[in-house]
Amino acid sequence: MVSIEFDSSHIDRFIKIVYGTRNELIDSDSYLRKFIEFSGTDGCINIIKNKYELIYFRFVNEKWTFYGDKKFLPKKWQLKLFQPIFVNLDKNLAYLGAYFNGNLRIIYTEDIDGRISTMYPCDYCVVNFKNNTQTNIINGYYYQKPLEYKDILMITNKGIVYFNSSSCIDMIISLLKLNLVGIETSNVISVLPKNIMDIVIKDFDSCKSSLLLNKPNNLYSNIFNQIKSNDSDFYCKKITIFNNKIIEILALNCASNYQSVINFVDNLKNDFITELQQLYRWFRKHPVEKKLVFSTYDDHGYTVLLNKIHEKILSIEDKKIPNKFWIPQKKIIDMFNENIDVYSNIGFTMDLVSAIKYRSQFANIVYHIFTLSNKKTEKNNFYPFKIFSPYLFILEHILNQ
């Protein structure tokens, strides 16, 4: 018996996204080559054709459960054809595989502690950097073509390296992580190949265009209605600016303007840090409300990040922070510096993505509790979320497209 879950977060834990130039990739002495740790020899490595063909599966509740992208995950009847394979699998392990040309291939096994315990070769496509070619294997036939230095998934002993992803989501999250640890967005974009950036920015413009055609998340409508009921003057002032800014960002064509991407990431980072700062202050002052929210969303990205900030503050507040409620943003940046390994700390990246992707869920319950904790006649505009941030709003909707 099998079941299917359209959830790619398990797969993302195995993937490290990096950007670089062709020379960095083919130079055996470069930092990038040392980091990637190729699994092949003499410049030849095995790669997967498409990251969306990856499938994570494990035995849960007396059945094999498959997690993956809804566009590429095999149908349930197709998965049932693999039943003979399941008979020989250890039900105490989890597996990362790929569905390719009607075949299910296992790439990694994962033990109970979430560590890669075994790696298997994967030969869908072989790259030779010396000859600058890639050879695809389709139905037993070999097709050779010039190598493109984008969307390359390389299997290593420690996970999958995704080199020069053309997805705007991958690019924005990567730039946000770098920005959070003090690396300027403009410095990163300036060294990336133009052909890679053009593809990413085209995808960014496409994602923004599709948002113009869709209705916003209903949870935001609920929050805005509560804000309007609490203080209509404040709401009317903010919502007009908010709406105009969103339309401006979505309508802006970034194809010939890299600066617009830089501005988006920089503003995104500033709003995100400010929001964490405000949330931490409010939860510290309202421990009962904090307990209620954290118990409801105990594994939410915001819960994880705020707990990490709290651990950081507790270790230093007696010496350096006179006001335990209002912490400097620099201390939040320090927390990110300690927790983000921009190349390998995949778990922390997933917490970061989860916080933004499901932001409206967390914000909705926080605002509901926030209004209940206020006096009924009091107009309190210090809602701890930076709810009128167009950048966080847009990225959440892009992540959920």
From Swiss-Prot:
To which species is this protein native? Acanthamoeba polyphaga mimivirus (APMV)
Q: What is the protein name given in its UniProt record? A: Uncharacterized protein L471
